[in-house]
Amino acid sequence: MKRTRIDLTEHSLPLAEIIKNYDKLTIAVSGGVDSMTLGSFAHRLLGRQQVKLVHALSPAVPKAATLRVETQAEAEGWDLRMVDAGEFEDEQYRANPFNRCFFCKTNLYQTLSGLSSGILVSGTNADDLQDFRPGLEAAQNHQVRHPYVEAGFNKDDVRALASELGLPQLSRLPSSPCLSSRVETGIRIERADLEAIDSVESWIQSEFNPKTVRCRVLAQGIMIQMDPLTLSGLDLEDQKMTEERVLECFQHRPSTKVRFSAYQRGSAFKIQELQT
């Protein structure tokens, strides 16, 4: 049964008024809580004829995220289209500079512009404006609108909205940037690395159910990061088993070293690149 009911609350009304003014819109859905919640809200508010949703298939997108989009689209009755944004044909993206996201989003929005007759919309929220987000420049270049930002919604507001929509699986979904963010700045983005990262993180999730996990490709080797509580609970046998799994997934990187550490946000990003 398709979910079509929406009950506006004092919390969601400002966002609804903004989206109603857009008329037809195309939403880029990554599989994360922000864009997925926005997609469900806009679709229930305006209907299938007014809202198109697009998901980019890419080695940088976890398989679980694509499956999540497909499942939600079926449950909600979305008008969903899968596309290849072509970022892997862009050498500027593959070089993995500090502003890699600019090139990724440029390719995405160029692709969406060719499909859309309405307004392009993203799931960017107000908290995102506090970070270094080169993708926002690409969005500005393509006249992409950010309804969460316009409504003053931060991440907590988005999670609250997901709960209001009866989507607890989204409200509890941890943040997870694209897989390319796990590769240290300056190391070329390779399909094999991203597939290995996805495999390792999926396996760790199934084995240890951590609150947070990142498999990072660094110049010094592979770094497995987990939230401190999960990491402290790993015994030597757990670490050995995990290391063996990592090496199996990264066979294309012979003699690589595997290390473990507590999760540190953005630790594959070399901020000094900004000064060069």
State the predicted function of each range.
Residues 120-123, 172, 178, 225:
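Short, conserved beta-strand edge motifs with alternating hydrophobic and charged residues
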Residues 212-214, 221, 257-259:
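Residues at or immediately flanking beta-strands
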Residues 219, 223-238:
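A short interface-forming secondary-structure element
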Residues 204-211, 249-257:
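Short secondary-structure junctions
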Residues 2-164, 222, 240-253, 264-276:
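ATP-dependent adenylation/nucleotidyltransferase module used to activate substrates
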Residues 54, 216, 225, 259-261:
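Solvent-exposed beta-strand sheet faces enriched in polar/charged residues
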Residues 149-215, 262:
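Mid-to-C-terminal catalytic subdomains of enzymes
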Residues 88-89, 184-186, 229-231:
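A short, flexible beta-alpha/helix-coil linker loop
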